[in-house]
Amino acid sequence: MTKYNFLCIDIGTTSLKAALVSETGQVLSFLKIYFNSKNIRTLSFEWMNAVKTALSKLNNESKEKVKIDAISISGNGPTIVTEDGQTFLSNEKIKIKKSIQKKIAPSLFLPRIFYFKNKFPESFKNKKIFSGPEYLIWKLTNNHITILPEDRYKAAYWSDEKIKSINLEPSQFGAYINTGAIAGTLDKVIAKELSLPEVPVVAGGPDFTVAIIGTNTLEVGKMCDCAGSSEGINLCTNIPVYKKGLRTLPSVIPGLWNVASLLQSSGRKFVECKIRRERKVGQKLTYEQYIAHCAKNPNSSGY
């Protein structure tokens, strides 16, 4: 038995991923819970049930009750969730006036929040505002926080002045804490529902940041491919690179940067190819089976 076990939860656009990871980084168990809701606006209502389902399945797969010492929460960003659960996914398109865009630049979040607020004004009146992982952390701990990957990211988030410029109040936003910090302790009632002790809940943050940390792309010259519904080829560098087609963001390591080439639809295209193959063979395929098929057939659409 390992000394410490960590439940790592990541919220995607279509599923919740859960992994039990040891203190040495060994993945002891992994599973994916797909969301059922066809209404993307209420998708956040499924997240807690997905956590319960994941824990139940992890325990069923184990010969003994799973021991969990802490929980880490990450998720896609910038998905926005209001206190009443209205959800605006990170891949949804927005359209706002250039004058507004200029006023709140370079924030990656405020343009989406402004657009969402105008669509659902009642959900924003004196109510808390979260990203996806922060909303689940709030549900688990009752703590309202904002996860900041590194101090240089503040401009990409918000300031009090910019929040007020779109007629919202700074009090609606959680206080900044850094990735890896303890966001709180599992609420007593929630702990009982999940059949867990009141363990620490750790701020994982945006899935992009967690993927960079998890693959140890934290030294100059290291590279990783982060793929989901979209994809990014990421390079760690000590020099920021600004060029069309590349996105440069601070690394979680002070003084370093992450340069990415983004492929916005590669994951969706892969799924479309998989579906076509399933129709052809008349049965559902796991991703492992489809990848094996592609690797054996250079002429296949998914090669």
Please give the residue ranges for each predicted region.
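Conserved ATP-utilizing enzyme core subdomain
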Residues: 17, 141-144, 283-303
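Short glycine-enriched loops at secondary-structure junctions
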Residues: 24, 77, 134-135, 182, ...
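Structured N-terminal alpha/beta-domain signature
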Residues: 18, 38-39, 43, 51-52, ...
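Glycine-rich beta-strand-to-loop/alpha-helix junction loops that act as flexible
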Residues: 74-77, 179-180, 227-229
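Glycine-rich phosphate-binding loop of actin/hexokinase-like ATP-binding domains
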Residues: 80-102, 126, 130-131, 141-160, ...
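Short glycine/serine- and small hydrophobic-enriched flexible loop segments
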Residues: 56, 114-118, 271-278
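N-terminal glycine/serine-rich phosphate-binding loop of ATP-dependent small-molecule kinases
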Residues: 1-87, 123-126, 192-203
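Gly/Ser/Thr-rich active-site cleft segment
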Residues: 11-13, 103-206
